[in-house]
Amino acid sequence: MCIRDRVNIERINVNSDPLEFSQTLSNIANDYAKKMYLEGFWCHKDPSNGNLVTERLLQVGYPPPQFIGENLAMASTIYSGHESLMGSESHRDTILDSEFKRIGIGIISGPNGLIIVQIFT
């Protein structure tokens, strides 16, 4: 089962609507996961330019979102990454937030496992 399906099952279980998949958000998430891997950092704020997820979206012409969230995880499998996010109150709150309507997911595999980036709008 893919991570998007796992997220939507969690949302349905708390009576939140499932999220619509966004390829644009996924491309942005994947690019950021790759950047963190290649440049060796782990942070919501890009150390090379100070950008947060909102700036990353606006830079590629994504319409300014009313609500935005981002989750980062490192894990050996998609399942363990999802479980790790659900085990963290702030990450779980982002996943379950009923204000969000769309999700994009980027996953990069490296020598130390997976880097997972989720973007919510």
PLM feature segments, named:
Residues M1:
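Phosphate/diphosphate ligand-binding glycine-rich loop within oxidoreductases
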Residues R4-T121:
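Functional surface patches built around histidine and acidic residues
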